[in-house]
């Protein structure tokens, strides 16, 4: 709902009445001295949000924030050293009232290797607090500020090199509620985008250090919601029920990229762009700048899984910027009739909840213990997310368009050729099981050697095919010996 003192037109009324000329704004803040006893701020980790401010006076609010440098999973089987506010990425969500006086305690854990500080965009003062909060490992800095402006604000570390601190996850959101508070909604969630720059490729297993050159070139390895691939999918998806009004507090830590924030299958009834106090109505996609925010509100009218993406779409399906809103309740066939989104649409390779199957095989292969059955299981997961749109889940393809893999004489005749096709694509006429095909398969060289090996092991041993395993070493050898078409990924 709106950051407003007046009552806006109800969401989705469709009444045809003229819109109010003023779509937002609020009563002036109460900037008098704090009243009552000091209040300890409630801090939450994404996607949770602290409860609304339930008072009608300015208070002294004490915020205790600890910086931790932690090795955490950025994707299944991939670890990264995150620098965090509050132990997670994004940092803890803070919720205060316009006119509050905030006493901010920034503590840098003794195990940290770096000094840190904090720049809160909600602060009026030099550096947004950064000049007063420089904190060495094992130390604590304290400063105070008055929340003069309402809105949804980013905070981040501003210690040199600033870009590196932000790229390692040092950002979060602080909400300054208007004096009258926010109108009630049914569900509120905290979603923050950021990109990460690793030495290894996307989903390359093991520990991955920060890559400064990639960051300078703005060539992100990962673009993620809430700090890790899969943070908002499967059992971790945010949840609502039909009829709920959902409010998303959306931030973008950057450090470089602007987010094209979109929920597939929903239209935002209201968007408070850049975290301000005026709203736009009936918005499909909203831009959230690096170091900026937006507050979106919408009513969910039908059940299903609604996919949250950065609509700069390769980031969603090839770099991880994908989440889920799962809505339960009764169908409303007058609004929407049809099947729920097919899983193969949800990711270029595989949904994050299935990554553990793939990761386990990768680990087993590195120790020489991977079995053929494990490779087939991992290959099935990867095939369903990558190949089944064209070749179909049953491997039968589409007659006259996409050749079959099931009982395929062409596939089974030459496993090395199959590797070359997976890496480099195929164009031109071929004959499969006696039928001609003349379509185009794009190179899939963005997949790593393990993934291609497991997909081929699955296809060579499914749907009546009886073949051998393909190893990642075989794929690596073909990758090294052949040249990719222009424009193919490496």
Where are these regions (language model features)?
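Detector for the c-type heme attachment site
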Residues: 158-161, 196, 390-398, 423, ...
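Sequence/structural segment immediately N-terminal to covalent heme-attachment motifs in c-type
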Residues: 372-398, 407, 411-424
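Flexible coil segments in periplasmic/lumen-exposed cytochrome c-class electron-transfer proteins
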Residues: 359-374, 380, 432-490
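Conserved beta-strand positions that form and line the central face of beta-propeller blades
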Residues: 134, 287, 324, 394, ...
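Copper-binding active sites and cupredoxin-like electron-transfer domains
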Residues: 6-381, 399
């Amino acid at each position: 709902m709106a950051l407003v003192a007046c009552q806006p037109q109800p969401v989705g009324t469709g009444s045809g009445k003229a819109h109010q000329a003023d779509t937002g704004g609020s009563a002036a803040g109460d900037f008098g001295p704090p009243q009552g006893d000091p209040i300890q701020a409630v801090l939450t980790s994404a996607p949770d949000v602290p409860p609304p401010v339930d008072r009608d006076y300015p208070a002294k609010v004490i915020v205790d924030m600890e910086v931790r440098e932690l090795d955490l999973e950025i994707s299944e089987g991939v670890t990264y050293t995150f620098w965090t506010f509050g132990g997670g990425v994004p940092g803890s969500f803070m919720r205060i009232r316009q006119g509050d006086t905030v006493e901010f305690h920034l503590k840098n854990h003794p195990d940290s290797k770096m000094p840190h500080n904090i720049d809160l965009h909600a602060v009026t003062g030099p550096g947004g607090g950064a000049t007063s909060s420089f904190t060495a490992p094992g130390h604590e800095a304290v400063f105070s500020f008055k929340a003069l402006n309402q809105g949804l604000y980013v905070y981040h570390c501003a210690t040199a090199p600033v870009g590196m601190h932000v790229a390692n996850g040092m950002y979060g959101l602080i909400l300054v509620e208007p004096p009258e508070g926010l109108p009630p909604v049914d569900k509120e969630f905290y979603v923050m985008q950021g990109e990460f720059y690793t030495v290894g490729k996307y989903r390359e297993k093991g520990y991955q250090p920060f890559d400064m050159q990639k960051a300078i070139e703005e060539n992100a390895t990962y673009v993620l919601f809430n700090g890790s691939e899969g943070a908002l999918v499967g059992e971790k998806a945010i949840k609502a029920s039909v009829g709920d009004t959902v409010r998303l507090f959306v931030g973008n830590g950057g450090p470089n990229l602007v987010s094209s924030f979109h929920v597939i299958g929903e239209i935002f009834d209201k968007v408070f762009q850049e975290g301000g106090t005026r709203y736009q109505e009936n918005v499909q996609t909203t831009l959230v700048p690096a170091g900026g925010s937006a507050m979106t509100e919408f009513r969910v009218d039908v059940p299903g899984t609604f996919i949250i993406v950065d609509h700069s779409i390769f980031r969603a399906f090839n770099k991880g910027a994908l989440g889920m809103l799962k809505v339960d309740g009764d169908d409303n066939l007058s609004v929407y009739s049809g099947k729920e989104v097919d899983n193969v649409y949800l990711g270029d390779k595989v949904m994050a909840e299935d990554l553990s199957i793939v990761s386990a095989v990768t680990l087993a292969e590195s120790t020489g213990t991977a079995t053929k059955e494990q490779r087939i299981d991992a290959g099935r997961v990867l095939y369903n997310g990558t190949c089944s749109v064209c070749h179909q889940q049953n491997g039968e393809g589409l007659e006259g368009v996409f050749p079959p893999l099931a009982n395929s004489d062409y596939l089974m005749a030459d496993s090395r050729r199959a590797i070359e096709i997976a890496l480099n694509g195929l164009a031109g006429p071929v004959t499969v099981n006696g039928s001609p095909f003349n379509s185009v398969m794009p190179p899939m060289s963005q997949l790593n050697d393990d993934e291609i090996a497991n997909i081929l092991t699955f296809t060579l041993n499914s749907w009546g095919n009886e073949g051998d395993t393909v190893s990642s070493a075989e794929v690596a050898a073909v990758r090294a010996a052949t040249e990719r078409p222009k424009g193919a990924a490496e």
